[in-house]
Amino acid sequence: MTKEILLIDDDADELEVFTEALRSVDKNIQCSHAKDLNEALDFLNHNSPAYIFIDYNMPTMNGLDCVSEIKKMEKLENTKIILYSNYISEEMSQKAISLGAYKCVKKPSMINVLIKNLKEILNH
């Protein structure tokens, strides 16, 4: 069964690494990309992915704002939203969860750690 995932990140290199890691976890994953909230909302108006991964640090709107906007879409009530960043404070994590995020994760510097984290998230 194909799992559809949306990655929201303005960094093309990060998207490439994340996509490769996801595909190493599960070959049946279909990844779509958006560089900002506007692109994401355009995509989400026509699609309902199983998971949405959002980078916290983006130029026009931070990840918490993205979580808040996406959670307003009723059709995505079962979609799991994961916020990720190089640094996740306890306060940021609590705020994201209160806004409806499924989980907050720190971006690991090593691909094998990223793959391990993704396996845990996707196999829940």
Model segments located where?
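Active-site residues of response regulator receiver
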Residues: 9, 55-56
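The feature encodes the CheY-like receiver
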Residues: 59-62, 89
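Helix N-cap/capping motif at the beta->alpha junctions
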Residues: 33-42, 63
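Two-component/phosphorelay signaling modules centered on CheY-like receiver
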Residues: 12-32, 99
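Active-site beta3 strand of CheY-like receiver
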Residues: 47-53
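Short amphipathic alpha-helix used as the core "switch/output" element in two-component signaling
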Residues: 42, 64-77
